[in-house]
Curated annotation (Swiss-Prot):
Lineage top rank: taxon: Bacteria
SUPFAM superfamilies for this protein: YhbC-like, C-terminal domain, YhbC-like, N-terminal domain
Family annotation (InterPro entries): Ribosome_maturation_RimP, RimP_C, RimP_C_sf, RimP_N, RimP_N_sf
Protein name: Ribosome maturation factor RimP
HAMAP family noted in UniProt: RimP
Keyword Phosphoprotein: no
Cytoplasm in keyword set: yes
Length: 158
């Protein structure tokens, strides 16, 4: 996280938690000539709806406007949303939540000739994950060292 996103996370986390929400991620990006501050929030169980996001957006906007000195060098567009069904798995809390769920994993290097896997996360520890993948009509457990995981996210099984 950058200093701006860390500051935003520090501001948003208590606001979200006071409402029973969870801050999932903060992004501060420039696309074309416009800056965007994207804040992803969720609520368990059941998720967060658009009305709750709109209410939280107003609270967040007010708090960010009060920051002095202003941490944003340029005008930006504030976007609050849920992370969606295919939310990223970024931290240990996300990994624990993903246990038993269907996930997508991209790797830095190939394992068994593949750099991407989708399957059910059966187990994990600090060093590796165990993913149950379907190969044709059979299921197979694949152990993946965490240090070779480039990215991971929840996935929808078809």
């Amino acid at each position: 996280m950058t200093k701006v996103t860390e500051l935003v996370a520090d501001v948003v986390t208590p606001l979200a938690e006071a409402r029973g929400d969870e801050l999932v991620d903060v992004e501060y990006v420039k696309e074309k000539k416009q800056y965007y501050l994207r804040i992803y929030v969720d609520r368990r169980p059941g998720g967060i709806d658009i009305e709750e996001i709109a209410n939280l957006s107003e609270l967040v906007s007010e708090k960010l406007d009060e920051l002095d000195p202003d941490p944003f060098p340029e005008p930006y567009i504030l976007e609050l949303s849920s992370p969606g069904l295919e939310r990223p798995i970024k931290n240990e809390k996300d990994w624990e939540r993903a246990k038993g769920s269907y996930i997508h994993v991209s790797l830095y290097q190939k394992i068994d000739g593949e750099k991407t896997f989708e399957g059910t996360l059966k187990d994990l520890n600090q060093d590796q994950i165990v993913l149950e993948v379907k190969i044709k009509t059979r299921r197979k457990d694949i152990t993946i060292p965490r240090k070779v995981i480039a990215s991971s996210r929840f996935a929808v099984e078809f």
